[in-house]
Amino acid sequence: MLKTKQEYQIYWATHHDVVATTPEEVIIYDMIDEMANDGNSSKFRENITKWVLGLTESKSKHGYDDDKMAIEVKPQNITREKTKLTGGGNFNDLTWRRHRKYLEDELLILQSGFHHGKLVYIVEFPYASIAPVLEARLQDVLPNGDVPKVYDRWGTFKCQDWGQHPYKVRYLSQDFIHYQPDISKCLREKLVQQLDESIIQGKMLLSTLNLL
């Protein structure tokens, strides 16, 4: 039985079909749907990504997306037809100083994919895997080093950048087959590849939450 706001949010985000059993749940799930697909804020999707992996919501307004570890959450949510999940993300305030700090801190990226607010997958990889493509951007924007109040606002990466390096699939939806048509070829291959390897090794990648 769901009791807390967090439990309702996780349940809604990790199940493709959610049926409200009471008038109160209709209101709750409508509110969650609105939060999950808010185009102006990714806070809900960041929290879901962390909660599913057993991490807690960050209380700090500065620094990384986790209060204890060097982690950045990069969720992607698609809500329009003909748009696909690509395994990509971006840094909108990158500088050489921050770039070097990310490397020194051995920053981990949690890149997650959402389909109309529903969690499809979570992959984990080191920031170092996407460092070359971000360095190329920094060379264009800040060729002579950092300049006060100047940032690389379009430091983007994609599946092809991290997929050629070691990565982990931390979560895969039990409804993955339903979402496959809306996943890019590169990302789909990376997710299925790890799933196949895990089956061979006798491991389960599908998330199992005690509260469910």
Language model regions located:
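Nucleic-acid endonuclease domains
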Residues: M1-M69, K74-L212
